C-alpha cells in the first residue's frame, strides 16, 4: 500500500511514546520503509525536554554523534536549537572529551514535531496504549514464545502491527511527588499511562520501579544574575551532526551558583516532609543525579553544593536550576531557593518534583532490544531502566531499526504470527559504539538503579571518540539504507584526506632550517613530522606552522590526522584486545540452549546464565559472577 493511503490498521511498526526514544524509533522505522504509527498521549508534547534543557555531556555527546552517524535525528535537532556550546574535558585526553549544548527546549520540541509530521511513511495518533496483544497467551494471561499482533488503546481501538516499540518514559504507571502531594502523572500536569505496566506484568514480564526528579523553574526577572558567576562557553558553536556545516545562532549565558549553610539548614529541618525519606517513595533514584535533600543528608560535611543556572530558551523567561532537584513541599522549595545568592526575591513558576514509574527488567531483552517473551516487541529508553535523553535516543534508534527489519522479514514469512527466520538484527558491539556498550550492559547486567552512560563504562573509549562516530557507524547505516549516499561519500573523502595528510607527515622530515626556526624541534632533527607528533610537547599548531602544505586541509582533517598519529601505539594495542574479544563475540549460543544439560557448571553460574540467556560467549563472560572455568565448560558444550 502507498505511504499516502494506509489507515490506522495493519501497520508494519507501532511506536508507543513520543519522547526522545520514540522520535528516533519512529523515524528510523519509517525511513527504512516500514509503514509506521507513533501513538502518544499528547501530540503537542512530542520531543518535550522533561528535565534539563541540554543535549550531550561526557559520553552522552558521543552517543548523540553516534545517533547522527547512524542516520538518527537528535544531533540535527540539537543543532537547530543550540543556544550555547561547550566541549567538556578539553584539558584532558580526546578519549574523554565530549560536546554539550544548551538547547532552546521549546524550539527543540517544535522542530521534532515538525520533523515527524513531514516524514512520509509515518502517521501520528493521540491515544494511550493499555495493552499489547500477542499470540501464545495462556488463560492466566502469561505469554511464552508469543508474537506481537496489535496494541489496544484506552479508547478501545485495536491497531494491528507486525512489530511494536514501547518507549514509555516516565509515564507508564507514573506517579509524581511534591511533599505531601502525589498524583498519577508522568510529568507535572500530564496524566500517567495507567494499565500498560500491569498488562506487561500479567504477561509474565519481570517489572520494577525507578525514580527520577527535576528541579524548580524560576522567573529570570526575579533573580539578580549580576551577582552570579558566568559559566564560560566556547566562542564557536560546533555542530553535533556531520551534515551541519556551521551554526550561526544567538548565544545564551549560563551561570554558576552555590547552596550554603542556610540552604542546608532549611532542608534539614524539613527532612520529615520529604517523600524520599518518609517512606512514600520506594523506588531507587539515579545515583549520579541525587536530589538536593539527598545530597545534604548523604554529605553532611559539605558546606555547599554547586548549581548551574540555565535558560530554558531564547523566547522564555524561565531558568532551570541544575542540581536543585527536590521532592520537598512547595513552601520549603520557596524557602531554600531564597537562601541562594541572587535569589532573595526569586519566584518559582514550576515546582520541583520526584516521579517514579514502571520499568521492565532489561535482562529479558536481546541485543536488538527485542523481548524474548514476545517476538516483535521491542523496548527502548527509560522503560529499560536508563536515564537521559541521549541514552533513550540511542536505544530508540536501534529498536526502531530492528522493528523495521523484523517487520520486513515477517512480510516474507509464509505463516503469519510465527517468528521470521529471515530476520537479521542490527546490533552494535562494545568496540563499535557507546550505544553498543550501553545495550550490552543493560541486557547482561540488568539495572537496580537508573543507568547513566560514562566514559569509564567503555573499555575501548579511545576508539569511541566523538569525532570518529562517522568512521565507526556511517557505512553500516548506509548498507541497511538509513544513511544517504552523500553522507557515505563524505566519509570516504574524509578518510582519504586524512590518510593523505598522515602519509605526507610521515614522509616530511624536520630539516636544520626548520629546527633553527622552531627550537622545540631541535631534538627531533631528521625525524618525520609524524614522529615529532608523538612528543606531547609538539603541538599541531607548530607542525602546521612548519608545513605550508597542510593549509590545503580543513581543521577537522588536521586534528583527525594528529590524533591518529599521536595515539597510534595505544590504538594498535587496543585493536589487539578487540580482536580477542571479537572471537568470543562470534561464538554464538543457540537461542534455546539448554543450560541444565551442561555438566560442570556451578549452581550460581547456571542460575545467572538462565536468567540472562546470553547470545554469545562474549556476553556470557561479562555476566557478573560468571567464572572463567564456567566459560570454558560452556565453550566446550556449544561446539
Short names for language-model regions:
Residues 7-21:
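Beta1/beta-strand and adjacent pyrophosphate-binding region of the FAD-binding site
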Residues 9, 27-131, 155, 167-184, ...:
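Conserved N-terminal/central alpha/beta ligand/cofactor-binding core
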Residues 133-157:
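Conserved beta-strand-loop-beta-strand element in the redox core of flavoprotein oxidoreductases
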Residues 404-411, 419-447:
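Active-site-proximal substrate-binding core of FAD-dependent oxidoreductases
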Residues 457, 463, 474-632, 636-638:
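Extended, charge-enriched "interface" segments that sit outside catalytic cores
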Residues 16, 158-169:
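Short hydrophobic core segments
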Residues 320-386, 426-440, 554-608, 613:
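A glycine-rich dinucleotide-binding beta-alpha-beta segment and adjacent secondary-structure elements
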Residues 42-44, 198-334, 432, 444-516, ...:
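An anion/pyrophosphate-binding glycine-rich loop and adjacent beta-alpha core
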Amino acid at each position: 500500500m502507498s505511504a499516502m493511503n494506509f489507515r490506522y490498521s495493519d501497520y508494519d511498526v507501532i511506536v508507543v511514546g513520543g519522547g526522545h526514544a520514540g522520535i528516533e524509533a519512529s523515524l528510523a522505522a519509517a525511513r527504512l520503509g516500514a509503514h509506521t504509527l507513533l501513538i502518544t498521549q499528547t501530540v503537542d508534547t512530542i520531543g518535550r525536554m522533561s528535565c534539563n534543557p541540554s543535549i550531550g555531556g561526557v559520553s552522552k555527546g558521543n552517543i548523540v554523534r553516534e545517533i547522527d552517524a547512524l542516520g538518527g535525528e537528535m544531533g540535527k535537532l540539537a543543532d537547530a536549537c543550540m543556544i550555547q556550546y561547550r566541549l567538556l574535558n578539553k584539558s584532558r585526553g580526546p578519549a574523554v572529551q565530549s560536546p554539550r549544548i544548551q538547547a532552546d527546549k521549546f524550539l527543540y520540541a517544535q522542530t521534532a514535531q515538525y520533523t515527524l509530521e513531514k516524514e512520509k511513511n509515518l502517521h501520528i495518533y493521540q491515544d494511550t496504549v493499555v495493552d499489547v496483544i500477542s499470540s501464545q497467551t495462556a488463560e492466566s494471561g502469561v505469554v511464552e514464545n508469543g508474537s506481537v499482533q496489535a496494541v489496544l488503546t484506552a479508547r478501545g481501538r485495536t491497531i494491528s502491527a507486525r512489530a511494536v516499540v514501547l518507549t514509555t518514559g516516565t509515564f507508564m504507571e507514573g506517579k509524581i511527588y511534591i511533599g505531601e502531594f502525589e498524583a498519577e502523572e508522568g510529568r507535572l500536569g500530564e496524566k500517567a499511562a495507567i494499565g500498560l505496566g500491569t498488562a506487561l506484568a500479567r504477561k509474565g514480564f519481570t517489572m520494577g520501579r525507578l525514580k527520577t526528579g527535576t528541579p524548580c523553574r524560576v522567573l529570570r526577572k526575579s533573580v539578580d544574575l549580576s551577582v552570579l558567576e558566568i559559566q564560560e562557553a566556547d566562542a564557536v558553536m560546533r555542530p553535533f551532526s556531520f551534515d551541519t556545516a556551521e551554526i550561526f545562532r544567538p548565544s545564551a549565558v549560563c551561570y554558576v551558583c552555590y547552596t550554603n549553610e542556610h540552604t542546608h539548614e532549611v532542608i534539614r529541618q524539613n527532612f520529615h516532609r520529604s517523600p524520599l525519606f518518609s517512606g512514600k517513595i520506594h523506588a531507587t533514584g539515579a545515583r549520579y543525579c541525587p536530589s538536593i535533600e539527598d545530597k545534604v543528608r548523604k554529605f553532611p560535611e559539605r558546606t555547599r553544593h554547586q548549581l548551574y543556572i540555565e535558560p530554558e530558551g531564547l523566547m522564555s523567561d524561565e531558568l532551570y536550576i541544575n542540581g536543585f532537584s527536590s521532592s520537598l513541599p512547595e513552601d520549603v522549595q520557596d524557602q531554600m531557593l531564597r537562601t541562594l545568592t541572587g535569589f532573595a526575591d526569586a519566584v518559582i513558576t514550576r515546582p520541583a518534583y520526584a516521579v517514579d514509574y514502571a520499568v521492565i527488567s532489561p535482562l529479558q531483552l536481546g541485543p536488538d532490544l527485542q523481548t524474548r517473551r514476545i517476538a516483535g516487541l521491542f523496548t527502548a529508553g527509560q522503560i529499560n531502566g536508563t536515564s537521559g535523553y541521549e541514552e533513550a535516543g540511542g536505544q530508540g534508534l536501534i529498536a526502531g531499526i530492528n522493528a523495521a527489519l523484523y517487520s520486513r522479514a515477517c512480510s516474507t514469512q509464509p505463516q503469519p504470527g510465527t517468528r521470521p527466520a529471515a530476520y537479521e538484527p542490527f546490533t552494535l558491539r562494545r568496540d563499535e559504539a557507546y550505544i553498543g556498550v550501553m545495550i550490552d550492559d543493560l541486557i547482561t547486567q540488568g539495572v537496580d538503579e537508573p543507568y547513566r552512560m560514562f566514559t569509564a563504562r567503555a573499555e575501548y573509549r579511545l576508539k569511541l571518540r566523538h569525532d570518529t562516530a562517522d568512521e565507526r557507524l556511517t557505512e553500516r547505516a548506509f548498507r541497511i539504507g538509513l544513511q544517504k549516499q552523500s553522507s557515505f561519500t563524505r566519509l570516504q573523502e574524509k578518510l582519504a584526506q586524512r590518510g593523505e595528510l598522515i602519509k605526507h607527515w610521515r614522509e616530511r622530515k624536520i630539516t636544520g632550517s626548520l629546527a633553527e626556526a622552531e627550537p622545540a624541534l631541535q631534538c627531533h632533527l631528521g625525524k618525520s613530522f609524524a614522529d615529532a607528533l608523538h612528543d606531547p610537547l609538539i603541538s599541531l599548531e607548530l607542525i602546521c606552522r612548519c608545513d605550508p602544505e597542510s593549509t590545503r586541509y580543513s581543521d577537522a582533517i588536521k586534528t583527525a590526522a594528529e590524533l591518529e598519529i599521536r595515539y597510534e601505539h595505544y590504538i594498535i594495542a587496543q585493536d589487539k584486545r578487540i580482536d580477542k574479544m571479537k572471537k568470543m563475540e562470534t561464538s554464538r549460543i543457540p537461542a534455546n540452549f539448554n543450560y541444565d544439560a551442561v555438566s560442570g557448571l556451578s549452581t550460581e553460574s547456571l542460575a545467572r546464565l538462565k536468567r540472562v540467556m546470553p547470545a554469545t560467549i562474549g556476553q556470557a563472560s561479562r555476566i557478573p559472577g560468571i567464572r572463567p572455568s564456567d566459560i570454558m565448560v560452556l565453550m566446550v558444550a556449544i561446539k
